[in-house]
Amino acid sequence: DAMLVQDLLGERCEIETILFAIPTVDDENKRRILSICNKTKCNVRILQDIVQLIANGGKDVLSRVRDVRVEDVLGREQIELTDLTNTLVSGKVVMVTGGGGSIGSELCRQIAACGPKRLIIVDIYENSAYSVQQELKRRYGSALKLDVCIASVRDSKKVDRLFARYQPDVVFHAAAHKHVPLMEDAPEEAVKNNVFGTYNVALSADKYGVGRFVLISTDKAVNPTNVMGASKRLAEIYVQSLSIALSHGEVAGKTRFITTRFGNVLGSNGSVIPRFREQLEKGGPLTVTHPDIIRYFMTIPEACRLVLEASVMGQGNEIFVFDMGKPVKIADLARRMIELAGLVPGKDIQITYTGLRPGEKLYEELLATKENTLPTPNEKIFRAHVREYAYADIAAAISRLSDIAATVDRVATVREMKRLVPEFKSKNSLYEKLDKFQIIPKHDSNESFSHRRSRVHRLQSL
């Protein structure tokens, strides 16, 4: 009985701190126990790595005690890297674009731990890159050969120069614009960075004989309802088409192109959890866009471990999707975070609903309607079976899209994106009007000239 436990722990025994130290408990019971503990007035902490602690004779107990984190109540299991994953980067020259970001920086941490020959961090944001550089220098010192390059993936000449200089064996392409509402307002920037940036890095990877190129994608690329998701879907399509062209001998090269696709990560820059923490510190309210909005979550370290695992098993031309577990209602997440702070939702801290933002879905999908998956040796990783695209057509289409984006015409840019990604249907966005017209990508010989001219005029008037 939760009330009985709360009374016993909080008052009768005059307990001030509860230390959770049950390493074998399953996720459901862990959440239940922590939920009961958090309803008391006690300070709740977790003793981690208890088995290792016992093996070390009980030394350094305090260093293994930490506060309860939101991932503890979401029930995400820890994933350990295999020896095969270590061989992917051990003794290799590894480049990470977007290496200062949430995913990119964690990839750098895990790669550094595997002993690469050299690690190259590429990022346009010098503060983020500098922070990761200093962290890795403190941890590894001269044992890690580390280079930080301030560069934009949009700059094809600079990208080519970096590849020529470092000759990387493995490339993780994590550089991207990711904020949905901002990209609705600046679709040309999403195209330049997410689409053309991927084009630049992938072409250089092929040109300089990179062994493996790994694209970090998102579940928002599936049946996209916003510009950001559509731009990432185009990046997926380009990488996949290039890989197919290589396998068919249409393009010279040996690079294995692999895509990894997953949902939200806990605590990434600008995401919901840091925002909730900031709102809690200010006394609330916690803002949620819709009472029924749900998202899949995994921790950043877990996502990066799965990226590395998928990179090992990939042979080229795969899109790997990850087991994201059970979806979480954002409203429930808000309540859990309030409770973790020792407060009562609706009493101490309010939750308010602000309405869906432009391009925002109530739920995300990891697979499109006509996609299905195949199992892999890792039970948390699946291979998506997706449609194939002709490389020459896609390369020409991206070149045209880049030219349109350069005009800074938002509507024209999004119109072309919808032509290339027909499943892209805008939601809560000014671009919804574009979906009212059928966009015919090729000339229909049975269509009269006057009818075709009328159709084009209607589209151009939007």
Spans of features found by a protein language model:
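Strand-loop microenvironment adjacent to phosphate/nucleotide-handling motifs in alpha/beta enzyme folds
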Residues: L84-L88, S241-L462
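N-terminal Rossmann NAD(P)H-binding glycine-rich loop of SDR-like oxidoreductase domains
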Residues: V94-C114
